[in-house]
């Protein structure tokens, strides 16, 4: 039977019962009295308030313990009556208060018992109990026989502390005592209740918060058989003593004590055996183990607050704040700020060289490609069809696949897909990224998409991969994805701020390194040269040298070339701005080979150059003067002879002691040039401003005659009319001496400058200095131009081409000279009997040249044509591929060589040209037809016409088709059925390719 204890009853109900019985004897019991009354009415009243509740112990099989908030004891009244010598105690239970009933089998009369006690002392003399003790003892034995089954179930008292429910018989059965009164019931139950006196609990029900049930699984009451005179007082022993042991204990908030305590389990017999001891009282049970254990709690004190309060809150003893900041996935600055947080960095991972932060809350990840923080981006990951977020496992798996294949995807997108998509969209190519990429694990495909429409972005709809997407290559991510690794931030750089950089400032005057630059040339120069006539800005690394000299206006010789078009000669800021290659030229005085600039040997603006002595043909890198040195000397000279702002005089150079050719020649031969001084015939006298050029560093100044202002005798070239397309300049005479004055049968400095200007316009095409990728490969170098001008007075036309031209005789105004032609010599009449793949094929050697062709054949298209940034430069490679892949009859004979697409793609990567984007695999519609074009002796001009047609056709294919026809074999372009003889020579191949591509354009476009 379950005993319940509660401290929450506002009231305890009153139970009233009446009995009728025969009259009997009367007697006394200690200080209490027992009386027997016929037809007496016994009223049991238990008053309980919020501060007091009823506590009772019943000997008929149940024990009820109630702890109250007050030390006062309730009043219990018990009246007994009986007419039979044999009585049976029965238990009748109600929900609130139940009275014990004794029924006589002889008279079928019943009596109810109740007890009251107001004293802590329970008398131990039970001998005076009534004469019917024998019968009483029998009944008591019957009652006592159940004592072994009585369990206090003390755990219920501690477990959850449910409300106190007095559902047991509070009153003991005292059979046969007719005269006993309520005083006789001052035994065990009352003693147990009285034992609570003095105990104080502020809120004992709180103790149930964390306590497991206290289970007393032993017999609380021992069998006391044979004690005829024992009454209910005999039950006032162990339980009362155990309860009394709690006296004096004080708990301000008992639930605190339960916070960390394990359940108290009293599995021992609380009460000792008191067999046969009629006079034993509750004192005999005061030495039990359970009582001792309970007594040990006396004096304990617990505070009201939980012991672990504030552990997870802020404070010196709390845990650190591990929360992550928020970020805006659309703002790169916000992403960098977020990733710089130490808690975020500790959660970042590395995969395939990329830094990753996986945000499981958003089903996204932040990617830092290849550790480049400038390219940080946030990528949302969802189900491609349902558009739902992924769980953590799938998110990590797909993130690993994306990182593993990102490098492969980037290369495929940048080189192949993006140019095609940009061309279709009509936007500039470069820098465009797909909006969405779907990685399909089922079909093992990866498709990139542009912006989705509302239907495609809706749930339950997968965008078409073939109509709307573009397949991209992610590599072998479906076989094996790379694992995530932790990042060692001790060796990896984190996101840097915009103001990143350490500044070192010298705070001590006079200390530290000297301000003058080191005389040692820099190994990696960066030169930006802006040449204006009379005022040139030379930017060498971080050193700017500006010189603009102004002289009084003087009368000078009228030049034949207008200077209005000789402004703003600008070479870009590259180390190879004037880096040209001329392996075939061995003429004297030229600056040949690869010209690599180095910084000036001194930081002053004297214009001096430092170089060891070498012969006139010494090239840079072999103890020869650097092009920077030559330009510096030229600049100093021009500042003198063309004084004033923005190029100075428009009437030609002022007479000086030397010419521009002398300056260049001296620098090339001796490593330095003498000072340029205006000649005395200007009328300005010795006070005219002059410019001095020192020989070497700190070398002595060289002063020459002011009357020497002629052009050096090594200035030569053919003469031409002023301003014509040949780049030549008029000269009065083809014969000149070094000391010939300007305007006196020699080319003027303006003529030389005009020729230089025209050359630079070709090798640096475009506005304001043109190409930023360095000079284009041409048929001659800048040194050749100056040498020819100094030698013959004219120079040949500069042609951007990978080959050199031939020499021929050209007449000038004052005679004739040997110069190079404008274009390469026309090829001999093509022969239909000469195999175009043979060594004697003139067209092949002409188009490719020996070294370039050999390089392309050896490397499979890896040979680079320097400066070949236009589509025309792709034709030699295509030609070389045709020579290798097709025989004389036009049949495909070699499949081992690289595809045409790979050659074109490599060309694009090298030159930055969009060119043809990929090889052709299949084309819609008819492939077109071709007709054989036979070449005759009069078809020389068709070579360039065919090349121009092929160029235009290829450009149209690149712009319109743009990979819509991917992967078609080259044989299908030049041969419809694989039979026939096509492409016998250059004319046939060019014409047929042009016609086929035109047919494709008509079919597709």
From Swiss-Prot:
Modified how: Phosphorylated on a tyrosine on attachment to the host cell. Tyrosine phosphorylation is temporally and spatially associated with recruitment of actin to the site of chlamydial entry. Phosphorylated Tarp seems to remain cytoplasmically exposed on the inclusion membrane at one side of internalized elementary bodies for several hours after entry.
Any GO CC annotation of this UniProt entry: extracellular region
Annotated spans, Disordered: 1-36, 73-155, 487-521, 542-626, 671-749, 792-847
Record-linked InterPro entries: Chlamydial_TARP (IPR053108), DUF1547 (IPR011443)
Keyword presence, Secreted: yes
Polar residues biased stretches: 1-10, 130-154
One GO MF term attached to the UniProt entry: SH2 domain binding
Keywords: Phosphoprotein, Secreted, Virulence
Main location: secreted
Protein's cellular compartments: Secreted
Compositionally biased residues, Low complexity: 11-36, 73-121, 542-578, 593-612, 720-736, 831-846
UniProt family annotation: Belongs to the chlamydial CPn_0572/CT_456/TC_0741 family.
PANTHER family: PTHR36975, TRANSLOCATED ACTIN-RECRUITING PHOSPHOPROTEIN (PTHR36975:SF5)
Task performed by this protein: Appears to initiate or participate in signaling events that regulate the actin recruitment, which ultimately leads to internalization.
The protein's name: Translocated actin-recruiting phosphoprotein
Organism the protein comes from: Chlamydia trachomatis serovar D (strain ATCC VR-885 / DSM 19411 / UW-3/Cx)
Species classification: Bacteria, Pseudomonadati, Chlamydiota, Chlamydiia, Chlamydiales
């Amino acid at each position: 039977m379950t005993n319940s204890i509660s401290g929450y009853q506002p009231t305890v109900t009153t139970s009233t019962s009446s009995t009728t019985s025969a009259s009997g004897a009367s007697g006394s019991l200690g200080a209490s009295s027992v009386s027997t009354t016929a037809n007496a009415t016994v009223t049991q009243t238990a008053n309980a308030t919020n501060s007091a509740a009823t506590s009772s112990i019943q000997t008929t099989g149940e024990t009820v313990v109630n702890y109250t908030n007050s030390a006062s004891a309730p009043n219990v009244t018990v009246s007994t009556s009986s007419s039979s010598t044999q009585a049976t105690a029965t238990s009748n239970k109600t929900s609130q208060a139940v009275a014990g009933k004794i029924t006589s089998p002889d008279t079928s009369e019943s009596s109810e018992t109740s007890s009251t006690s107001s004293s802590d002392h329970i008398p131990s003399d039970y001998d005076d109990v009534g004469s019917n003790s024998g019968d009483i003892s029998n009944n008591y034995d019957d009652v006592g026989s159940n004592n072994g089954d009585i369990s206090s179930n003390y755990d219920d008292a501690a477990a959850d502390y449910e409300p106190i429910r007095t559902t047991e018989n509070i009153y003991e059965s005292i059979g046969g005592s007719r005269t006993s009164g309520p005083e006789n019931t001052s035994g065990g139950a009352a003693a147990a209740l009285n034992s609570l006196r003095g105990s104080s609990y502020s809120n004992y029900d709180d103790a149930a918060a964390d306590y497991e049930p206290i289970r007393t699984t032993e017999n609380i009451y021992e069998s006391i058989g044979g004690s005829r005179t024992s009454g209910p007082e005999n039950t006032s022993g162990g339980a009362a003593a155990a309860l009394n042991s709690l006296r004096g204990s004080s708990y301000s908030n008992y639930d605190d004590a339960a916070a960390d305590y394990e359940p108290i389990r009293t599995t021992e017999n609380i009460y000792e055996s008191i067999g046969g001891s009629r006079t034993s009282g509750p004192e005999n049970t005061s030495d039990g183990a359970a009582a001792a254990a309970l007594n040990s709690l006396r004096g304990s004190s617990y505070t009201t607050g939980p012991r672990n309060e504030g552990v997870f809150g802020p404070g010196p003893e709390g845990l650190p704040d591990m929360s992550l900041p928020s970020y805006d996935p659309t703002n790169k600055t916000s992403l960098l700020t977020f990733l710089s947080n130490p808690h975020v960095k500790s959660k970042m991972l590395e995969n395939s060289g990329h830094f990753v932060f996986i945000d499981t809350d958003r089903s996204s990840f932040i990617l830092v490609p290849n550790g480049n923080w400038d390219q940080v981006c946030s990528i949302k990951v969802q189900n491609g069809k349902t558009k739902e977020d992924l769980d953590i496992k799938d998110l990590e798996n797909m993130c690993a696949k994306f990182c593993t294949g990102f490098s492969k995807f980037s290369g495929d997108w940048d080189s192949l897909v993006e140019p095609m998509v940009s061309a279709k969209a009509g936007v500039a190519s470069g820098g465009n990224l797909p909006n969405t990429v779907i990685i399909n694990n089922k079909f093992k495909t990866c498709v990139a998409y542009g912006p989705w429409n509302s239907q495609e972005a809706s749930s339950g709809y997968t965008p078409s991969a073939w109509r709307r997407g573009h397949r991209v290559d992610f590599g072998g991510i479906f076989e094996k994805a790379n694992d995530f690794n932790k990042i060692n931030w001790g060796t990896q750089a984190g996101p840097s701020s915009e103001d990143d950089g350490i500044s070192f400032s010298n705070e001590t005057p006079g200390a530290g390194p000297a301000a003058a630059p080191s005389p040692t040339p820099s190994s990696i120069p960066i030169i930006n040269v802006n040449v204006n006539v009379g005022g040139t800005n030379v930017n060498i690394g971080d050193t700017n040298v500006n010189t603009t000299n102004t002289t009084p206006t003087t009368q000078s010789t009228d030049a034949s070339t207008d200077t209005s078009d000789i402004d703003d000669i600008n070479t870009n800021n590259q180390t190879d701005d004037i880096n040209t290659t001329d392996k075939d030229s061995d003429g004297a005085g030229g600056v040949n080979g690869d010209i690599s600039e180095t910084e000036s040997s001194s930081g002053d603006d004297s214009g001096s150059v430092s170089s060891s002595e070498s012969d006139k043909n010494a090239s840079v890198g072999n103890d020869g003067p650097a092009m920077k040195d030559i330009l510096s000397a030229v600049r100093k000279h021009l500042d003198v002879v063309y004084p004033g702002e923005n190029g100075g005089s428009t009437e030609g150079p002022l007479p000086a002691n030397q010419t521009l050719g002398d300056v260049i020649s001296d620098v090339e031969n001796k490593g330095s040039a003498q000072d340029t001084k205006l000649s005395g015939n200007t009328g300005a006298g010795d006070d005219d401003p002059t410019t001095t050029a020192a020989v070497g560093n700190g070398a002595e100044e060289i002063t020459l005659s002011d009357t020497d202002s002629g052009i050096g005798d090594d200035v030569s070239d053919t003469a031409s009319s002023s301003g014509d397309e040949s780049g030549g300049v008029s000269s009065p005479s083809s014969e000149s001496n070094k000391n010939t004055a300007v305007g006196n049968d020699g080319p003027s400095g303006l003529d030389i400058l005009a020729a230089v200007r025209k050359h630079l316009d070709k090798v640096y095409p475009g506005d304001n200095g043109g190409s930023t990728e360095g000079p284009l490969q041409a048929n001659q170098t800048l040194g050749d131009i100056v040498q020819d001008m100094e030698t013959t007075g004219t120079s040949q036309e500069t042609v951007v081409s990978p080959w050199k031209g031939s020499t021929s005789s050209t007449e000038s105004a004052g005679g004739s000279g040997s110069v190079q032609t404008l274009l390469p010599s026309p090829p001999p009449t093509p022969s239909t009997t000469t195999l175009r793949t043979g060594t004697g094929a003139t067209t092949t050697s002409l188009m490719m040249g020996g070294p370039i062709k050999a390089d392309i054949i050896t490397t499979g298209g890896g040979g680079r044509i320097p400066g070949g940034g236009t589509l025309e430069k792709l034709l030699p490679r295509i030609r070389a591929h045709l020579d290798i892949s097709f025989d004389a009859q036009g049949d495909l004979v070699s499949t081992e060589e690289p595809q045409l697409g790979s050659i074109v793609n490599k060309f694009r990567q090298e030159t930055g040209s969009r060119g043809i984007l990929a090889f052709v695999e299949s084309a819609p519609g008819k492939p077109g037809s071709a007709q054989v074009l036979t070449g005759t002796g009069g078809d020389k001009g068709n070579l360039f016409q065919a090349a121009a047609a092929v160029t235009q056709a290829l450009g149209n294919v690149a712009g319109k088709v743009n990979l819509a026809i991917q992967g078609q074999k080259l044989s299908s372009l030049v041969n419809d059925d694989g039979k026939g003889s096509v492409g016998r020579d250059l004319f046939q191949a060019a014409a047929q390719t042009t016609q086929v591509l035109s047919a494709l354009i008509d079919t597709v476009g």
